[in-house]
């Protein structure tokens, strides 16, 4: 993962309405194994984060100037340090307007992954821990807590520059229940949601369920194809990449690589050729689970409609082919 440019600034602010104080670095960070490891860990944590949203820049304006500064940097009008400085000053201003915001170290990293250029921006915080010294003493130790990543965004620069129709070249952590505490960070990037990740994923899963039903597949085959879909989607989510419908179709049925793709197009589900994978929605698709008053039920989603029938009006489940272990226990009860 070649790192083109990387810099860190510090905004010191407490969530009490006090002014935000900027401590800006005046030069880029030199290449090092530590920087590479930090960015690799950041990407891993970011990709694993649930609740991300995908979108595109608002038209450049006084309210949303970030995309203009980024374009100026990419066009050679200013260097990376100057770009990050004007951007972090804008973030500082928005922080002061948001009483709930807290400061932290602001990372800007322009890097390449494969043939694609990305810009990652993250607000990082420290955690207090302990370490053992060479003299075997235990001493306090501070470290960047990349596992607790709450404000971060990643811009696919290549997609932004080369695909003017794209509405998903920016991803950002949306926050639980769309918390307003993170809105200032989204406004800092100047991002508007262009793709409903959970909604698109739900539509894809609905299309897949319809496909399996229309093909009248045996249970083993349905289970195998379900696993293929979920594994592929989870893998793409881990990489931070969207799911390609044509690629997915080829994986689902190698003998008929276009079958699922043609099903999606013919039924007009309205899906884009590439969609972001929402991990929370995928996890719900794997299994249905529920627990109440001493009763716990969990079953694989593909069993619904075959071994398990749901009567919505009566609020009942009918289970066919009970596990032998369960029937033995029930028999022993008598």
From Swiss-Prot:
One family from Pfam that matches here is: NA37
Name the source's superkingdom.
Bacteria
Q: Which family does it belong to?
A: Belongs to the YejK family.
**Any Gene Ontology CC annotation:** cytoplasm
- One example GO MF annotation: double-stranded DNA binding
Localization annotation: Cytoplasm, Nucleoid
Per UniProt, which keywords does this protein have?
A: Cytoplasm
- InterPro entries per record: Nucleoid_associated_NdpA
Q: Which NCBIfam families match?
A: PRK00378.1
Question: What's this protein's name?
Answer: Nucleoid-associated protein PFL_1060
Q: State where it is primarily located.
A: cytoplasm
């Amino acid at each position: 993962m070649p790192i083109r440019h990387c810099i860190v600034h510090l905004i010191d602010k407490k969530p009490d309405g006090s002014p935000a104080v900027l401590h800006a670095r005046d030069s880029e960070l030199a290449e090092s194994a530590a920087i590479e490891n930090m960015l690799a860990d950041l990407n891993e944590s970011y990709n694993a984060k649930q609740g991300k949203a995908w979108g595109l820049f608002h038209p450049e304006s006084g309210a949303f100037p970030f995309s203009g500064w980024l374009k100026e940097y990419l066009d050679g009008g200013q260097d990376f340090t100057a770009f990050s400085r004007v951007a972090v000053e804008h973030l500082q201003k928005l922080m002061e307007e948001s009483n709930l915001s807290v400061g932290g170290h602001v990372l800007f990293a322009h890097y390449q992954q494969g043939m694609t250029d990305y810009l990652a921006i993250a607000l990082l915080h420290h955690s207090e821990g302990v370490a053992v010294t060479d003299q075997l003493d235990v001493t306090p130790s501070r470290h960047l807590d990349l596992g607790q990543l709450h404000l971060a965004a990643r811009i696919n620069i290549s997609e932004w520059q080369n695909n003017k129709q794209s509405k998903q070249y920016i991803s950002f952590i949306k926050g639980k229940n769309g918390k307003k505490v993170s809105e200032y960070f989204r406004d800092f990037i100047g991002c508007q949601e262009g793709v409903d990740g959970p909604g698109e994923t739900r539509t894809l899963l609905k299309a897949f369920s319809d496909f399996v039903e229309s093909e009248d597949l045996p249970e083993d085959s349905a289970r195998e194809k379900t696993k293929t879909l979920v594994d592929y989607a989870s893998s793409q989510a881990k990489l931070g990449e969207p799911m390609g419908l044509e690629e997915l179709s080829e994986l689902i049925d190698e003998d008929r690589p276009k079958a699922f793709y043609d099903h999606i197009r013919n039924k007009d589900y309205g899906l884009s050729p590439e969609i972001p994978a929402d991990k929370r929605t995928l996890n719900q698709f794997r299994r249905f689970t529920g627990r109440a008053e001493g009763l716990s039920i969990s079953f694989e989603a593909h069993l619904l409609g075959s071994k398990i029938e749901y009567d919505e009006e009566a609020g009942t489940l009918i289970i066919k082919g009970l596990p032998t272990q369960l029937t033995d226990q029930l028999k022993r009860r008598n």
